[in-house]
Every structure is written in C-alpha cells, then in structure tokens.
C-alpha cells in the first residue's frame, strides 16, 4: 500500500480576510469603541437614571427641588465689563447679590441678580482661586485649587482688597492632582458642613466639619468625611460647582463636561437632573462651559459659564427683586 503525503495548502491572505470577516472585525472594533465611549461618558448610567426619573417622577417631585420643572429665563447674557473666565457662584442672602471669582487676575466680583457687575475686589496671595461660598453675614470661603487650600475671608461693604495672609486657612493634601483639585463649594448652615468638590480623576465630594472655625470658645478641630458610594453614583465626568439647598437638605452638583446639573438627596442618591444641552429646558444653545451654580431663597437658579456668560433658570417667571 502506498501512502501519499498531503501537502498543506499555502496560507491565503485572501481567504483569511474575506469581506465578510473584515466587516465582522470592523463591527467588533466599532462596538468595543462605543462601549468604552459610553462608559467614559456614563451614557448607560444616565440612560438608566432617565428611566428611573420618569418612573418615579410623581413621588420624587414632592420631596425634592425637582430640576425638570426649571426653564431658562436669561440665556447666555454677557457680563458687561468682565472679559475674564468666571469660576463658581454663590448667593448672599443678606445683600441679595451674587459673588463669583476669577483667577487671572485673582479677584472677587459682586453681581446683581440680573448679572450686572456691582464691584470687583482684588485678591492677593491666592494662586488659583476657583470657588467662593457664602457662610454667614460677611463671611466667605475661597478655594485655591492647586494647593487644595481653603481660605476664610471677611467681605464688608467697604472692603477694597483681600490678602490671604491675613485670613484663616486650611490646607488639605487629599489626592493632589495639579490643576484637577478643589473646584466647587457648598455650605450647610444648619449642619455646619462645608462640601468641597474635587474636579476629576477621580470625582469626589468631601464634607468638612470644623472649618471655617466660627466658635471662638471651642477648640479648632477639623474632620473630613467622604462617601465613595455616593461619588460612584455620580454619573458625570467632572465637577465644576456645588449648591446646598437648606429647604430639602439636597445637594446640586454641576458638571461642565457632562453639561448637567444633578440633584442628590440626603442619602447621596440622584433624584433629578437639569440638562444644559440645546433644546433642553428652553435653551436655544448648549451652555459652553458651565463653571458655577447658585440658588437664591426663592428657588431661582443662577449659572455662569466661561468666559463671561450669565444664565437664570426658574420654575415660574421670577418677579423683579
């Protein structure tokens, strides 16, 4: 019996890469890219929350700020006389005005509720002022982003400048990450909690107890609390600003990259959102780079965007203050 050895067929590129296989490979690569992109932008988390928000709207609406009911009233109004990039926003209930900061040059700007500049106050000794928060009458906290420094300052009607060297300060070396440090502030006056937002990599919200030190008869003791579970539930790519609502005890978190304001309840669970994209909430154009959000005692939302744009959102057409 004669055995004939079979010669293996030579490898054929044309057989290995048939049009059908090439198409399948391209589809797999594209699908993988879409999944990664969706995870990066938290698309799936946001889609799932949108379903939950719709399903539980009736129940959640009664116990929350409920951002879906807000509509834009002033859109992309340039802040006249201010060409610098504004960062953060806070409402002063005593003066019934707003305050923001810029870092080049470093200064505080007081605004009317219609977005008009009332005064500017130069800052000295602040490397990268990124946020300002009202604490009590005449008392504010300013963040220095890169140094992760919190500075308590006094701001009177006749204040002409502020020097950080004269102020109470607190430095926190938590997850130092260059220009991705402390980006937003909010204050719970009843609970004496200062919320501090870390911009990204990773997104974090810290609760600081004991700063600013307001009780001279008690020792200066600072306690920092974080909530990794809450932070993971934040389906945003970054954090730009915070706002605490005394009425509900809820926290608003503003994201520039996600173009979104998220309302978090007392357990840190998202309960409602306000999209900053064109066509949403009456917006004719998307908010380009949202940097600060504040709420007044009537529930009106104010928002600033770089370079110098001013927005107002409310549930009803607000009366003139």
Curated annotation (Swiss-Prot):
SUPFAM superfamilies in the record: Thermostable phytase (3-phytase)
Tell me, what's a Pfam family for it? SdiA-regulated
Localization annotation: Cell inner membrane
Sorted keywords for this record are: Cell inner membrane, Cell membrane, Membrane, Signal
The question of whether Signal is a record keyword is answered with yes
The protein's name in its UniProt record? Calcium-regulated beta-propeller protein CarP
Induction or repression: Up-regulated by Ca(2+), with the highest induction during the transition to the stationary phase of growth. Up-regulated by an unknown molecule secreted by P.aeruginosa during stationary phase, probably an autoinducer; induction is dependent upon one or more of the quorum-sensing synthases, LasL, RhlL and PqsA. Up-regulated by Fe(2+); acts synergistically with Ca(2+). Up-regulated by UV as a part of the oxidative stress response.
Lineage, uppermost ranks: Bacteria, Pseudomonadati, Pseudomonadota, Gammaproteobacteria, Pseudomonadales
A single Gene Ontology CC annotation of this entry is: plasma membrane
The consequence of inactivating this gene is: Impairs growth at high Ca(2+) level, causing extended lag phase and decrease in growth rate. Raises the basal intracellular concentration of Ca(2+), and impairs recovery to the resting intracellular Ca(2+). Significantly alters the morphology of swarming colonies at elevated Ca(2+). Reduces pyocyanine production by 72%. Increases sensitivity to tobramycin at high Ca(2+). Reduces survival of the greater wax moth Galleria mellonella infection model, when in the presence of 10mM CaCl(2).
Q: In which family does this protein belong, per the annotation?
A: Belongs to the YjiK family.
Look up the record and give one Gene Ontology term from the biological process aspect.
pyocyanine biosynthetic process
Q: How does it sit in the membrane?
A: Peripheral membrane protein
From what superkingdom does this record's organism come?
A: Bacteria
Q: What does this protein do?
A: Plays a role in intracellular Ca(2+) homeostasis. Involved in modulating Ca(2+)-induced swarming motility and pyocyanine production. Plays a role in regulating virulence in a Ca(2+)-dependent manner. Involved in cell protection against oxidative stress in the presence of elevated Ca(2+).
């Amino acid at each position: 019996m004669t055995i004939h050895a079979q010669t293996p067929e030579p490898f054929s590129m044309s057989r290995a890469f048939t049009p059908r296989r090439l198409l399948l490979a391209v589809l797999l690569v594209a699908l993988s890219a879409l999944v990664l992109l969706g995870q990066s932008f938290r698309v799936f988390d946001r889609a799932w929350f949108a379903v939950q928000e719709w399903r539980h709207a009736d129940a959640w609406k009664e116990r929350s700020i409920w951002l879906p009911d807000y509509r834009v009233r002033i859109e992309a109004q340039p802040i006249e006389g201010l060409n610098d990039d504004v960062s953060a926003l806070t409402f002063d209930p005593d003066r019934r005005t707003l305050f923001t900061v810029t870092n080049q040059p470093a200064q505080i700007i007081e605004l009317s509720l219609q977005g008009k500049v009332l005064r500017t106050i130069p800052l000295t000794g602040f490397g990268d002022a990124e946020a300002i928060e009202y604490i009590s009458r005449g008392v504010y906290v300013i963040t220095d982003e890169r140094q992760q420094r919190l500075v308590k300052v006094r701001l009177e009607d006749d204040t002409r400048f502020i020097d950080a060297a004269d102020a109470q300060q607190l430095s926190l070396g938590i997850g130092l990450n260059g220009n991705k440090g402390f980006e937003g502030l909010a204050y719970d006056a009843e609970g004496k909690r200062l919320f501090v937002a870390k911009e990204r990599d990773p997104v974090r919200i810290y609760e600081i107890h004991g700063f600013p030190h307001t009780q001279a008869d008690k020792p200066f003791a600072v306690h920092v609390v974080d909530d990794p579970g809450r932070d993971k539930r934040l389906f945003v790519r970054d954090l730009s600003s915070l706002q605490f609502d005394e009425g509900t005890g809820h926290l608003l978190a503003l994201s520039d990259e996600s173009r979104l304001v998220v309302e978090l309840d007392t357990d840190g669970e998202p309960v409602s959102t306000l999209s900053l994209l064109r066509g949403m909430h009456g917006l004719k154009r998307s908010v380009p780079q949202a940097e600060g959000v504040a709420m007044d005692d009537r529930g009106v939302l104010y928002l600033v965007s770089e370079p110098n744009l001013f927005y107002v959102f409310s549930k009803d057409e607000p009366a003139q203050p």
